[in-house]
A protein has these predicted regions:
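Conserved helicase motor core of SF1/SF2 NTP-dependent helicases
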Residues: 1-2
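A short beta-strand micro-motif
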Residues: 5-10
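Aromatic/basic micro-patches that form nucleic-acid/chromatin recognition or nuclease catalytic surfaces
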Residues: 12, 39-77
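Short N-terminal binding/cap micro-motifs at the start of the first secondary-structure element
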Residues: 14-18
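Short secondary-structure capping micro-motifs at structural edges
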Residues: 19-24, 60-61
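Non-catalytic terminal regions with compositionally biased, polar/charged low complexity
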Residues: 28-29
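GIY-YIG nuclease signature motif recognition
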Residues: 33-38
């Protein structure tokens, strides 16, 4: 499958996370939507984003591996 996907994330408390070359980024408690794209295997990409333990490969991984962040829902288009 080729296209875009959306992740609905819940940040459980205010956080400051170092995100690769972006440096420290502040996230307020609440809901966020991440928009990603892929040439194929979107369902596998979504499943990977839902895992807490993984090699940090993309900027979103710095957020999704945090214990105070949950992927609530995901959709691929």
């Amino acid at each position: 499958m080729r296209g875009v996907y959306l992740l609905l994330l819940m940040v459980g408390r205010d956080l400051k996370i170092r995100i690769g070359s972006l440096g420290v980024v502040e996230f307020k408690r609440g809901y966020y939507v991440y928009v990603g794209s892929g040439q194929r295997y979107l369902e596998k990409r979504i499943q990977r984003h839902k895992k807490k333990i993984k090699r940090v490969k993309w900027h979103i991984d710095y957020l999704t591996t945090n214990s105070d962040v949950r992927v609530i829902e995901a959709a691929a288009y």
